[in-house]
Amino acid sequence: MSSYGFIKELIEKEHTPTPAYVFDLDRMKEFVKKVQSCLGESAQLCYAMKANPFLTGPMMDVVPTFEVCSPGEFRICERVGVPMERIVLSGVYKNPEDMEYVLSTYGGKGVYTVESLQHLQILNDTAVRLGMKITVLIRVTSGNQFGVDEADIRKIISDRTDYPGVEIEGLQFYSGTQKKDLSQMKTELEHLDEFIGELKSESGFEAQVLEYGPGFFVPYFKKDKSEDVENILSEFRVLLESLNFKGKVVLEMGRFLAAACGYYVTSIVDMKVNKEQPYVIMDGGINHLNYYGQAMAMKQPYCTQLDTEGNEKTGGEEESWNLCGALCTVSDVVVKRFPLHKPQLHDILVFERVGAYSVTEGIYLFLSRPLPRIYFWTEGGGLRMVRDGVHTDLLNSEK
């Protein structure tokens, strides 16, 4: 069990404390600083805010830049005060109206990614029309719908004087998440290094920046192999320092930076045994809780059972229970055969490592259940509610 410094205050503060998310900002900042310390000067961090947009404001203290992938994410940055100079405006779909707004409002500051020839044309034409030159990174495809084919990149670089509204600063690459070792990262980085060298020899293009998404593994489940973060980052740093490319490396990370700081707190609201199978019903379920890689509810996440006063329950023999949510679908099984200690109504279950994606990935509108409250926690400031519960029935009806 982790030390849940927030749980007593949550119980005292709210008559019905669940369901709720709690994000431990002290833990988040401590971890991000540790990551940057391990990397040293070999790379800078860029927070991919899609992992958890609620952490955008707090992340401003510990990361230099933010990857922003939609107009909605951009508006969040505006509201919390992220300077345009710290934004990498990414995303596979960019429409001219949005680009017109950003460029005319912020004067061409920030960095923009190019995901297609059309992207390049939109960005260039808008910048030229507004009398400015903007900085762009070209995303290299990893073989899916994202990014630009290498053959097209070669042509863009060769014809770069045809785009007077953009300054091509370098390349961006991201192929996926939850990579369990460094072998794929090594292959990708070596290929990018070679490609950058070819662009220089073929077209005299000197890349200044390589933005790379490593996709480090987060061990969500008890049977996952937990590697020492310092060792992993130390080995990764060696990979970076072995590259021929000596420009600035920016590491785009979301899940890896955010996952550990988050907790989902839910309560037991019903218990039953059906055909010799014991079931616990919780006041939250798959609409609130999503672990990447969970398969048929068979994998056991890190979760602690507490009594109504917030004390861990440890006495007596463990019993295996199926933990189910409040949705009217047989799919709402969070974990099968999870060990509990004499569960009772109103016992609290705290699921760990939900700082990334769960807060936005759930099927929130299904069955018009309310959205959970969201809290920030710090040792010095205690709990602060940053979003109250939201009734979703208003979004699921005509009036």
Language model regions located:
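N-terminal capping/small domains of soluble enzymes
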Residues: 2-96, 339-358, 364, 386-387
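Charged (often Lys/Glu-rich) extended helix/loop segments that serve as interaction or gating elements
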Residues: 6, 11, 248-399
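Conserved active-site and cofactor/substrate-binding residues in soluble primary-metabolism enzymes
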Residues: 23-30, 54, 118, 151, ...
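Active-site-proximal beta-alpha core segment in soluble small-molecule metabolic enzymes
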Residues: 43-209, 235
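Glycine-rich beta-strand-to-loop/alpha-helix junction loops that act as flexible
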Residues: 175-177, 210-220, 253-256
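Short glycine/threonine-rich loop-to-helix capping motif typified by GTGT followed
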Residues: 181-187, 219-232, 259-270, 336-339
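Acidic/histidine-enriched ion/cofactor-binding microenvironments in catalytic or ligand-binding pockets
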Residues: 205-207, 227-244, 335-350
